[in-house]
Every structure is written in structure tokens, then in C-alpha cells.
Amino acid sequence: MIAPGPTLETARLILRPTALEDLDGFATLAGDPESARFIGGVQPRAMAWRAMSAMAGSWALQGFAMFSLLEKSTGRWVGRVGPWMPEGWPGTEVGWGLLRDAWGKGYATEAATAAIDWAFDHLGWTRVIHCIAPENTPSAEVARRLGSKLLGPVKLPPPYDTIAIEAWGQSREEWRARRK
């Protein structure tokens, strides 16, 4: 079963709503110390289930959530990318979290580009942010490649309120001007 929502495609990737079959991927992402370092830290499979369920629930309640990210060539789940704005979040975010073996391939930038286009065109967002830990230089580089600028420190809601986070972002107009 797949949560309600659209499927997006890029040259190499499929972005679709969360499906029950994604649990192994979510658990691998949550269980790897490097992959999970900046997305809440290592979590057991039961917490990966909760995170996956939160994504599916957000699709049902808000009409958006991070997409499950699949390689087109293999159909393999490689991460989650897309719009995210839970209660108390500092803004309309497009975020990403990829399995370690999917790093360095340009997937985060490619998928986030499709997700930002969708958020601006279909959700009517006027601004997008990316919440990034200052020491997460690879994600800061993705934000730069997307055309976002460092906006400054932001506070996330509990239980993440003790983590130093910086917002990167841009307006819909800035995004569209850059995409022409």
C-alpha cells in the first residue's frame, strides 16, 4: 500500500509517496551511524517504522511529505527527499536523507530540484528552507547547488531543540529566476 500523493520522475530517480515496502530502507537509513548522523541519530527499526508512518500520515493529513526516493535503473529505495513541515517547524522545508551508498551521485540535488518545483507549483509555497547542521558540509553544498543562501540559526521543536541548526533558503521568485 502506498500513501496518497503524486509520483515524480527525474532522469535517474523516482519520487513517490511512502509505501509499506519502504521499511527496510527506512530502517537501514536510521540504523547507519553516518547516514543518520544529521537526521536524528541512530534509531532502531521500531523508530524507523514510526518515522515512515509519520511520512505516510503527513501525506494523508497535509497533502505532502518527503517522497521515497528510488533509483530508476534498479527500483531500489535510496532515501527520502521532499517537502516537510511538522508542527512547530521553522518554515516550509524541502529536506533530504539518503543511504550512504547513494551519496556523491548528485541524487540529493536532482531529487530536491524536482521536489522544490512541485512544492512551489502544486503546494503554492512562496519560500523553501533546508534545515542543516552547521557541520553537515555535504548538505550545505547541496543547498548551495540548489541556489539557497544561508539565512541563519533556527530552532527546531522538541526533541530536536538542543541541536544547532541553520536554515538555508530562497523564495519562489529566486528559484524561478534561477531555473530560467
What is the predicted function of each stretch?
Residues 44-63:
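Active-site rim helix/loop that mediates acceptor-substrate recognition in acyltransferases
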Residues 1-38, 53, 66-180:
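Acyl-donor (CoA/ACP) binding surface of acyl/acetyltransferases
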